[in-house]
Amino acid sequence: MKSDIHVCAVWESEHDRPVYTLDDTCPECGAEAVNSAPAPFSPEDSYGEYRRSLKRRSRE
C-alpha cells in the first residue's frame, strides 16, 4: 500500500529530524521526498516462506 505521507530522502544529512510532507519535494531543503511507508514484505526474503508456513500452522 502506498502512503500519501512522504519523508525527505536526505533528512539524515540535511536535517536534525525526519521532515514529513504530503508533497513530492521537501519543504525545507527542496530535495526529493520518498514514500515513508515500508514495504510489507521483500520478494528477496529468504525466510518468508518458512514464516508464512508457521503462521498458517498456528492458525489451524
Curated annotation (Swiss-Prot):
Pfam families attached here? Nop10p
Keyword rRNA processing belongs to the record: yes
GO CC terms on record?
A: ribonucleoprotein complex
Biological process terms in GO annotation: pseudouridine synthesis; rRNA processing
Which GO MF terms does the UniProt record name?
snoRNA binding
The segments labelled Disordered in the record are 36-60
Keyword line: Ribonucleoprotein, Ribosome biogenesis, rRNA processing
Family under the similarity heading? Belongs to the NOP10 family.
Q: What functional role does this protein have?
A: Involved in ribosome biogenesis; more specifically in 18S rRNA pseudouridylation and in cleavage of pre-rRNA.
Name of the protein in question: Ribosome biogenesis protein Nop10
Q: What is the lineage of its organism?
A: Archaea, Methanobacteriati, Methanobacteriota, Stenosarchaea group, Halobacteria
- Gene behind the chain: nop10
